[in-house]
Amino acid sequence: MIPTGEKIHLLIKGSSSANIPCELKSRSKLSPVTNGGKTIGKSNKVSKND
């Protein structure tokens, strides 16, 4: 019984939080292929800044 807008919001929140473990994996080199390479690029930038 969730309104459509609320469902979409939850889906967006879910997908963005699902990307966090992927980034952590990429940074620790456990999973080099995630999100078509987009996450890897972000993670590499973050690692260099660290």
Curated annotation (Swiss-Prot):
Residues 29-50 have a biased composition (Polar residues). Residues 28-50 are annotated as: Disordered. It comes from the Bacteria. This is Uncharacterized protein HI_1524.
